[in-house]
């Protein structure tokens, strides 16, 4: 070896192996596998820093031949741990990827117009009159969104769509509209439905006198005739069985209504007979009795009504009788006594009211002289008059 040149050994064996297998160092003509440096540069700072990084001056010179955008051919042969074939622990950051230049825009550009389906169903390119740089109007076949933009994927090629795909899309767009139109009835169908409703309405059946007579005869026998009886009646009256059945239903409803009304009238008649008619009879047929024999010790005449106590159970109250003028207390005795024991009860009551001294002789000396047949007939006559009166009131209302 020359004195001017010395062999430089790297500090780490990995760096030496890298330098041995490096194609850059082997590409020089007649160079040894070891890296040689001038003697003056052996102990310089450049040599030490290069040795520490695991590379020599030759690497920097050889890598300067490649451009900034070209790749070093030695990079694929080196390890992937280091960016430039270095096994050192000081691994530099990988270079940032360079942005790709934008692709040149073509002169012809596509414009998507309004999203309308052409009538012929084929794709047409409408070329404007602008020459080479004219725009192509490409209609879309997708469903328009609420903002007016057709809902197509951004990378779909509208020009490349074939007719089959377009026909499928067109059918998909028209399908919901056709279904919606099929669900809604047309005006003609509405008119037909209204006419059908009018036809279902049936006219009111009018019965003749003969038909009503036959129906009433059967109704007097039974209110619920069976199917056989209804069919026989329909044959006799020239009606349908359904009409006969409906007539019986209406007739039963009318009968029930009359029954309820009759019960209400009976209740009303009962109350009027029990409470109103006896009061009217008393006021019309009876008057107050003034008897001079009822004069007491003070000498004042006191008018006594005919009925002092309730007179409904007592027949004598409702039938006045003529008595001889000598018997002063005969009317009061007839009213208060029905049997022999009744006279004693009447004496007790009247004695308590007017004093026992003036009433005792007359009551004790009076003998009953009743007429039961006349009383019974008068009660029956009054009851008949009451029934006639209630019937007249019910028919008037």
UniProtKB/Swiss-Prot annotation:
Gene3D superfamilies hit by this protein: Homeodomain-like
GO terms, molecular function: DNA-binding transcription activator activity, RNA polymerase II-specific; RNA polymerase II transcription regulatory region sequence-specific DNA binding
DNA-binding region: 200-259
PANTHER family: HOMEOBOX PROTEIN ARISTALESS, HOMEOBOX PROTEIN ARISTALESS-LIKE 4
Name listed for the protein in its UniProt record: Homeobox protein aristaless-like 4
Family to which this protein belongs: Belongs to the paired homeobox family.
Function: Transcription factor involved in skull and limb development.
Organism listed in the record: Bos taurus (Bovine)
Disordered: annotated span: 59-131, 175-204
Motif OAR, residue numbers: 377-390
InterPro entries on file: HD (IPR001356), Homeobox_CS (IPR017970), Homeodomain-like_sf (IPR009057), OAR_dom (IPR003654), Paired_Homeobox_TFs (IPR050649)
Top-rank taxon, per record: Eukaryota
UniProt gene name: ALX4
Subunit structure as annotated in this protein's UniProt entry: Binds DNA.
